[in-house]
Regions:
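Anion-binding alpha/beta catalytic cores of soluble intermediary-metabolism enzymes, centered on
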Residues: 1-332
């Protein structure tokens, strides 16, 4: 999977911002990326500290651009742009204070077109990586929420699972008068479509199963109606994808069960992209696949943003940073 992405990136190297340029894991991954020559890293941090940490670790980052928010020549322009984007919610002073931090500064570099993608979270929390993205980069046209998926790899086998990390549950959004502005089913449908699109980037021809404890109306209650209604909406949103549900996991992956429980479905028995009705199921599901099924898990990969921005685990190692950088750039 990674070799194919690297070959694509070599033809069109992308700029990727690392918000924690001082971190040894980021520096080790950066050195590997520089050696590979298929990405252009930009490190955020104090120049002297970043260089000292690289030298201490023996990481060659010669030629890599290092930007310090506290000495950045274009800060006034960046502050003005952020004030405009926040639409009166933050004063110039508040914006400047936020931009002194790598997470906001790096996100604005992407928003202003200086780089195409961003990877953070080695020391920042998920909230501190996602919040600036939502406030500044925002969601892409036609998408209402950010979600996530994992690409799971076992040998030559690849599957996608979403949402396993961002949306806790799906509830109707209502305005002050109590009118539904975005239904729970619409939200889950968007997760399905965005996960299918992500899967396609990684060479998966998506066959999307909307998972439940019920198959094609066999059960009632819980999130059955949510998954059923979301299936219909997702089909309308993206008729180019095979999407079906609701269905149980065995009906999704076992051809004989799929044929028995959901006859006529193009997805049942052949699914490779799995949409969970809540974060509990999603998080448990991908970890079962990882720990008992022998799949390698890559993610969470954020979806729905107007530019590729991804969040690392604070327990990540340099190899995980390296691979997530490739994944993030591949989404441009």
């Amino acid at each position: 999977m990674f070799n194919a992405m690297i070959e694509t990136l070599k033809a069109n190297p992308r700029k990727i911002v690392f918000t924690e340029g001082h971190d040894a894991r980021i520096l080790e991954a950066t050195a590997r990326l520089v050696e590979g020559g298929f990405l252009t890293p930009i490190l955020i941090g104090n120049v002297d500290e970043v260089k000292a940490n690289a030298a201490k670790g023996g990481f060659n980052i010669e030629g890599v651009e290092i930007l310090d928010p506290l000495t950045y020549a274009g800060m006034d322009e960046m502050v003005a742009k952020m004030v405009e984007l926040r639409k009166g919610k933050m004063s110039p002073e508040e914006c400047k204070a936020a931009l002194s931090k790598g997470n906001y500064f790096g996100t604005m570099l992407v928003k202003m077109g200086y780089a195409e993608s961003l990877l953070g979270g080695a020391t920042y929390s998920t909230a501190d990586t996602v919040r600036p993205a939502l406030q500044l980069v925002k969601t892409k046209k036609g998408v209402n929420l950010v979600s996530s998926c994992f690409i799971m790899v076992r040998g030559d086998e690849k599957i996608a699972m979403g949402d396993c990390a961002i949306n806790l549950s799906y509830e109707d959004s209502v305005d002050k008068e109590g009118n539904v502005t975005l239904s729970a089913a619409q939200k889950l449908a968007e997760v399905a479509v965005e996960t299918a699109r992500t899967a396609k980037v990684f060479g998966i021809d998506p066959k999307v199963a909307m998972l439940s404890f019920s198959t094609n109306g066999s059960g009632k209650g819980g999130t059955v109606k949510l998954s059923h209604d979301a299936t219909a909406i997702a089909k309308e949103l993206a008729p180019e994808f095979d999407i079906d549900g609701e269905m149980q996991f065995d009906a999704a992956v076992a051809p004989e069960v799929g044929q028995l429980k959901f006859p006529g479905s193009k997805v049942a028995g052949h699914a490779n992209t799995f949409i969970f009705p809540c974060i509990e199921a999603g998080n448990i599901g991908y970890k079962i696949a990882q720990r008992l099924g022998g799949f390698e898990a890559y993610g969470p990969i954020l979806q729905g943003l107007a530019a590729p921005i991804n969040d690392l685990s604070r327990g990540c190692n340099a190899d995980e940073v390296y691979k997530m950088a490739i994944i993030t750039a591949a989404l441009v």
